[in-house]
Structure formats: C-alpha cells, structure tokens
A protein has these predicted regions:
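Conserved acetyl-CoA-binding loop-helix of GNAT-fold acetyltransferases
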Residues: 91, 97-111, 133-137
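Conserved beta-strand-loop-alpha-helix junction that forms the acyl-donor binding cleft
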Residues: 122-132, 148-152, 159-160
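Conserved N-terminal entry element of GNAT/NAT acetyltransferase domains
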Residues: 1-13
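Conserved acyl-donor/pantetheine-binding loop and adjacent beta-alpha core of acyl/acetyltransferases
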Residues: 68-87, 93-97
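Conserved beta-strand in the GNAT
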Residues: 53, 59-70, 85
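Helix-loop element at the rim of GNAT/NAT acetyltransferase active sites that forms part
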Residues: 20-34
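Active-site rim helix/loop that mediates acceptor-substrate recognition in acyltransferases
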Residues: 31-53
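Conserved GNAT acetyl-CoA-binding A-motif
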Residues: 112-124
Length: 160
C-alpha cells in the first residue's frame, strides 16, 4: 500500500500535540523561542497564515505553516506577486531521516503550484544542514543569506 501525506488545518485542539513537539530536543534546537507556542496559537485565525498538521497514513507527525509574503518580509527582497513562505518541523523523532521532510514539503508545494502560486520561499538557519538538504531535495535553490528578526537565514526559492 502506498504512503501519502495529508494536510489537516490546525485547530486549538492540536495545541497540546504541537506543545509536545516543540519540547522535543530535535525541534527545540531550531524552534527555541519561548514565545513560539504563543505565536502559533495566536495565529490560528490569521488571514495571511495557514497552519497544518501533517500526517502520514493517518498518523500526525509534523507541523507546517504557509504564509503570504508581507511587509515584514522585506529582507526576502522583491518577490513575484502571490509568493508564499513556508515553515515546518517534524515533531515525531522516529520520522526523521526517512525523506519525509522533503516528501511532504514537495507534496504540499506541488498542490499550491496547481492553484497558481508562482513561487515558494523558505528561510532556514544557515547552520541547519539537515533542513537545507531536505529543502534542496524538495526542489528549492539557495538564493543567499538574508537578515531576519531571528538572525541570519538562508533564503531558498522554488518556482512553479
């Protein structure tokens, strides 16, 4: 039986799961801001941000947020109208290293591209080679180092 990823809109009922994931050492290394949970829960109804729980064959294992590029993304430079940004993490440690990061990111973005989104951007820490490799496997290309409110980031882009 083939495996497939599903993307369910996140609800307030998912917050205990996301809180547990944020406490996992492999997530906390990169999502360590103490206000992260507050930002995630406070943005559940934000019109420019969609948040999802990613599942594989019915098992939740990751968090994904997709957002409209806005004024606070000036460090990304000029982007085509309709460009979206993406952030994600795999919460379940046993799902690391199996190609799931690049797999679900590619599946999600391919779906957006069929809806007319022209470009996706992502901005991992330049010190996170695992994430950078997953994004490259998902079709992203390195664009350059940018300064963000969270510090230096590697801007990566994937065009439709």
């Amino acid at each position: 039986m083939a495996s497939f990823y599903t993307f369910r809109p996140m609800t307030a009922e998912d917050m205990p799961l996301v809180q547990r994931w944020l406490a996992e050492p492999h997530v906390a290394e990169w999502w360590h801001d103490p206000e992260t949970l507050e930002f995630i829960s406070g943005d559940l109804d934000h019109h420019d941000l969609a948040q999802f729980i990613v599942s594989l064959d019915g098992r939740p294992f990751a968090y994904l947020q997709c957002y409209q590029i806005g004024d606070w993304h000036v460090s990304f430079g000029p982007q085509p109208e309709g460009t979206r940004g993406l952030d994600q993490f795999i919460g379940e440690a046993d799902m690391l290293g199996g190609g799931h990061g690049s797999g679900f990111i590619r599946a999600f973005i391919d779906r957006l591209f069929t809806r007319g989104i022209p470009r996706m951007v992502i901005d991992p820490s330049p010190d996170n080679p695992r994430a950078i490799r997953a994004y490259e496997k998902a079709g992203f290309e390195k664009s350059g180092i940018v300064d963000t409110p969270d510090g230096p980031a590697l801007l990566m882009v994937r065009d439709a």
